[in-house]
UniProtKB/Swiss-Prot annotation:
Subunit structure of this chain's protein: Monomer and homodimer. Part of the essential Sec protein translocation apparatus which comprises SecA, SecYEG and auxiliary proteins SecDF. Other proteins may also be involved.
Catalysis performed (reactions): ATP + H2O + cellular proteinSide 1 = ADP + phosphate + cellular proteinSide 2
Family according to the record: Belongs to the SecA family.
PANTHER family, per database record: CHLOROPLAST PROTEIN-TRANSPORTING ATPASE, SECA INNER MEMBRANE COMPONENT OF SEC PROTEIN SECRETION SYSTEM
GO cellular component, one term: cell envelope Sec protein transport complex
Primary location recorded for the protein, binned into one broad class: membrane
Superkingdom of the source species: Bacteria
Gene3D superfamilies with a match to the protein in the record: Helical scaffold and wing domains of SecA, P-loop containing nucleotide triphosphate hydrolases, SecA, preprotein cross-linking domain
Designated name of the protein: Protein translocase subunit SecA
Residues that coordinate or bind ATP: 99, 117-121, 631
E.C. numbers: 7.4.2.8
InterPro entries: Helicase_ATP-bd, Helicase_C-like, P-loop_NTPase, SecA, SecA_CS, SecA_DEAD, SecA_motor_DEAD, SecA_preprotein_X-link_dom
Name of the encoding gene: secA
Single GO term (MF): protein-exporting ATPase activity
């Protein structure tokens, strides 16, 4: 039925394109009409359109004229030089109809899928211009600084010709210039630069003058699938060095390495013994039918199954798995042990290992044997890794009648500190094991200049400046024997998912989005529109070539490279990691094939390498770095030879990454071809392929070195990729559900902080905090007054110690009502506050000689006090939330929903945070003592006072002393 309706009415994509096509015709008509205008007359269109918007016309109504203006300017600029990255380039671009289609879609809030070379950069200029007419912030988000700078200089020239201002944010942009950049009509920059400025404005700035942003209206994200999907699980974090250096990584690194060594040696021994049995059959196609021999083979495969749980990448195991029948037998044991009735046998078998490694879920578990071995290694310090039952420990302290209340409190503090130390050591042990067992050099990271540099799993690019969180980075540093740096403390954090939700309007463009359309729709409410190509795509997509083993696959790849190289075709070989790129490079050198390698280790030469990759006879081996954001242009000889030939050495877990690699060739009507070479030992096939795979292999096994190619195998690959994509989508959605809780709290705190920064009268803000504290105290006092063991005198003692007031017990009992008691306490505190700060204000006025300036100084002082406590308590809260997030997963064991538990407990934590902030502010205000000392000063010295207070510097004209706060710090 649906197919019939689609044939009759067209698909939703076709209907949208048809509707937008009418607008394209209007745009072209406007372009033709504007051709008769002079340059000055055309430039005047910008203020005219702005005024019409201010007068109430919608952007949708202005779209045809605005886009027509941009197209006409592009036509007028043809042949003129534009300086881009220090070079003069000749402008040669006028938007095609398909580009105008994409531009209309982006203004409407779509993600436009446009193929490589179709001109996404120029397409974005039109919606940028249209939305900039509002005077609101308009941002173009790129994947790196180079593209931001290039696009601003190149296509930004159109916007500047029309009288708009453009700015570019790069990592080196100084703070003092960022505010001016954000004032521009259109700003180019990376997601991290925009995101970090948002965090700095809301967590680092201590005055409104230090804030640089001016809001979030419209953003176009280039390579939107990379930013919102690949990077979705990587939050932006502003952090600083932690207060203490955790020595656990240095102390335990050798012992952990030894434990992993024991595991490796044990697995090697088991594998070697199994191979002795299996060696005679590795070169045969059919296993013997003798019952005793088959029993021995089965037991050897059972032993290798155990090896797969201890060292999944063991060489003997991988060699044996090349034989389809032996591979099927190992997998049969895996199915056997996973059956419910065989769980006890499985646990008994696994107990012989020190550590069980779950490669599929990227996890591991220390067995009882491993724990005993660990205890033996650390000797008497074993209990340092045993978690304490805090409820039981506290109960023992309470039951001890010999302890005074003060002693009990001190004991509880000591027990809590001991528990914290044990958790830190246990966490350090787990991260060291993770570093050794699951993190691989030249795949997950590289070692460079005594540092661990993360490799982005999707782009293959080094991520300098980024660090793995939760101590994993320190654990890898210990593993690789580089300098172990201090753990960082988080000051502010936000995920890209929630950052981009701040924009009123969001759009994007990429060459690969349709496979993730469901996620864009459900999480961001963004729809994907596939825009037709300007010229037909001439790429030849060859069927995938499947080989039994990795060894056969590489032999076939080299043979294919040699064959294509003889024809003069430029060749781009895509690899999944630095390790594979270097391995293939060694093989090519052995075969005397000149080539260039592009990976995370030599990314600085990327532009130079890519520039030469389209020349006739060029051979380039690259990681996923070459799969996105690169445009390989062919010379005439290369086009004549058949264009760029793309060879994939494996399928990525995401179909998008494969499509990106294919998209490097056959750009804008050029010839080209793409082919993937796969083996059944590839990670994707090994971990995520269908169980039917072994049956297929046994039936279709070809002779050594011969490829298999069948639509059935293509479906297997697609099924495996969909399975991984579904799992990753679930993880991202799950992460977002937790971050949504944090996001609401973040927005509340940032709104409070901004109110303080922008408040004109901080005395009013301070009194509001006093009233909140008074209400909290009223609840506490009245709740305690009705308790069996009333400690009202202790509360009053604490109150009189913290604040310069004394409560009247009889008055409190007479009032009885929470609101009345809160008003009573609030009046006392506000009266004391007024007395204190009125005297201070009078003293400042006398010294300065200006009541307005004295008021300004007092406002700055109050603002600094309030902001400092918001920031300090928020940092502590972030740590508490991280701990809660890591612990709440265990609640599922008790049949509780971890997310519901997280929401409930985080709400209680947030209530405590707000209370703690307010109490800390009010206590500080009453403990604060300030004095201004007369000195020789210039007339412009007053602003220096406020600045010096913020920076805690010594300053000359007046001396500011803060006392009474040491106990709080």
């Amino acid at each position: 039925m649906m197919d019939f309706l689609k044939r009759f009415f067209g698909s939703s994509q076709e209907r949208i394109l048809k509707r937008f096509q009418k607008l394209v015709e209007e745009v072209n008509a406007c372009d033709e009409k504007f051709s008769s205008l002079s340059d000055d007359e055309l430039r005047k269109k910008t203020p005219q359109l702005k005024q019409r918007y201010q007068d109430g016309e919608s952007l949708d109504k202005l779209l045809p004229e605005a886009y027509g203006v941009v197209k006409n300017v592009c036509r007028r600029l043809a042949g003129t030089p534009v300086e881009v990255s220090g070079y003069h380039q000749q402008w040669d671009m006028v938007p095609y109809d398909v580009q105008i289609l994409g531009a209309i879609a982006m203004h409407k809030g779509f993600i436009t899928e446009m193929q490589t070379g179709e001109g996404k950069t120029l397409t974005a200029v039109m919606p940028l211009y249209l939305n900039a007419l509002t005077g609101k912030p308009v941002h173009l988000v790129t994947v790196n600084d180079y593209l931001a700078q290039r696009d601003c200089e190149w296509v930004g020239s159109v916007l500047r010709w029309l009288g708009l201002t453009t700015g570019v944010l790069v990592s080196g942009s100084p703070p003092e210039k960022r505010k001016a950049i954000y004032q521009c009509d259109v700003v180019y920059g990376t997601a991290s630069e925009f995101g970090f400025d948002y965090l700095r404005d809301n967590s680092i700035a201590t005055r409104k003058e230090e804030q640089v942003g001016r809001g979030f209206y419209f953003a176009i994200i280039d390579e939107i699938d990379s930013v919102l999907i690949d990077e979705a699980r990587t939050p932006l974090i502003i952090s600083g060095p932690g207060e203490k250096h955790n020595p656990v990584y240095f102390e335990l690194k050798d012992r952990v390495a030894e434990l992993v060594y024991f595991q490796r040696e044990m697995c090697n021994h088991i594998a070697i013994e199994a191979r002795k049995v299996l060696d005679p059959f590795l070169g045969t196609d059919v296993l013997p039918k003798d019952k005793k021999v088959m029993e021995a083979i089965s037991e050897a495969c059972r032993a290798l199954w155990l090896v797969s749980k201890g060292m999944p990448l063991n060489r003997v195991l991988r060699r044996v798995r090349e034989h389809p029948d032996l591979r099927a037998m190992i997998d049969k044991w895996d199915v056997f042990y996973h059956a419910e009735q065989n769980k006890e046998q499985c646990l008994e078998k696994l107990s012989s290992l020190y550590i069980v490694v779950d490669e599929h879920n990227n996890d591991f578990e220390l067995t009882d044997k491993g724990m005993l071995q660990w205890i033996e290694k650390i000797g008497g310090a074993a209990e340092d890794f045993v978690m304490m039952d805090m409820g039981h420990e506290y109960a023992l302290i309470e039951e001890d009648a010999t302890l005074s209340p003060a002693d009990k409190l001190n004991r509880k503090i000591a027990v809590s500190e001991k528990d914290t130390q044990r958790k830190a050591r246990a966490h350090g042990l787990r991260q060291l094991l993770r570093a050794h067992l699951l993190m691989e050099k030249d795949i997950d990271y590289i070692v460079r200049d005594d540092q661990i540099v993360i490799i982005d799993e999707h782009t293959g690019r080094p991520q300098s400046g980024r660090r793995f969180s939760e101590g994993l980075h320190q654990a890898i540093e210990a593993k690789e024997h580089v300098t172990i740096r201090k753990e960082s403390q988080t000051f502010a954090t936000v995920t890209l998912q929630n950052f981009f939700r701040l924009y009123e309007k969001l759009a994007g463009m990429t060459g690969t989005a349709i496979t993730e359309s469901r996620e864009f729709k459900e999480i961001y409410s963004l729809y994907v529109l596939q825009v037709p190509t300007f010229k037909p795509c001439l790429r030849i997509d060859h069927n995938d070539a499947f080989y039994m083993t990795e060894r056969e696959k590489y032999q076939a790849i080299v043979a294919e490279i040699i064959s294509a190289h003889r024809s003069g075709k430029p060749i781009l070989i895509g690899t999944e990691s630095v390790e594979v790129s270097e391995k293939l490079s060694r093989i090519l050198r052995q075969n005397r094939i000149n080539h260039t390698v592009l990976n995370a280790k030599n990314h600085a030469q990327e532009a130079e390498i890519i520039a030469g990759a389209g020349k006739v006879g060029a051979v380039t081996v690259a990681t996923n770095m070459a799969g996105r954001g690169t445009d390989i242009k062919l010379d005439e000889e290369a086009v004549a030879a058949g264009g760029l030939y793309v060879i994939g050495t494996s399928r990525h877990q995401s179909r998008r990454i494969d499509r990106q690699l294919r998209g490097r060739c056959a750009r804008l009507g050029d010839p080209g071809a793409a082919k993937f070479f796969l083996s059944f030992e590839d990670r994707l096939m090994r971990l995520f392929a269908s169980p039917k795979l072994n049956t297929l292999i046994r039936h279709f096994r070809p002779p050594e070195g011969e490829a298999m190619s069948d639509p059935m195998f293509d479906r297997l690959i697609e099924t495996a990729q969909k399975r991984v994509e579904g799992r990753n989508y679930t993880i991202r959605k799950h992460t977002l559900e937790y971050d949504d809780v944090m996001n609401k709290q973040r927005q509340t705190i940032y709104a409070f902080r901004n109110d303080v920064l922008h408040a004109e009268d901080l005395f009013v803000v301070a009194k509001e905090q006093i009233e909140h504290v008074a209400l909290a105290l009223a609840f506490l006092i009245l709740k305690d007054a009705h308790a069996d063991h009333c400690s009202l005198p202790k509360i009053e003692e604490w109150l009189s110690y913290s604040f310069p007031v004394k409560l009247d017990d009889q008055e409190i009992r007479r009032l009885g009502d929470v609101d009345a008691v809160a008003d009573y306490i609030g009046d006392l505190l506000i009266e004391a506050f007024d007395v204190k700060f009125s005297a201070m204000l009078a003293e400042f006025t006398e010294i300065i000689g200006s009541a307005a300036n004295a008021q300004g100084i007092c406002n700055d002082i109050l603002r600094s006090v309030i902001i400092s406590h918001i920031d300090e308590e928020w940092k502590v809260h972030l740590v508490d939330m991280d701990l809660l997030r890591s612990e709440v997963g265990l609640r599922s064991v008790g049949q509780k929903d971890p997310l519901i538990e997280f929401k409930n407990e985080s709400f209680l934590l947030f209530e405590g945070l707000i209370r703690d902030i307010r109490i800390a502010i009010v206590k500080h205000l009453f403990a604060l003592e300030l004095s201004l000392t007369r000195s020789d000063r210039p007339d412009n010295a007053i602003p220096t006072v406020a600045t010096a207070f913020h920076n805690h510097d010594n300053f000359r004209p007046m001396e500011l002393t803060i006392v009474g706060e040491e106990e709080e710090s």
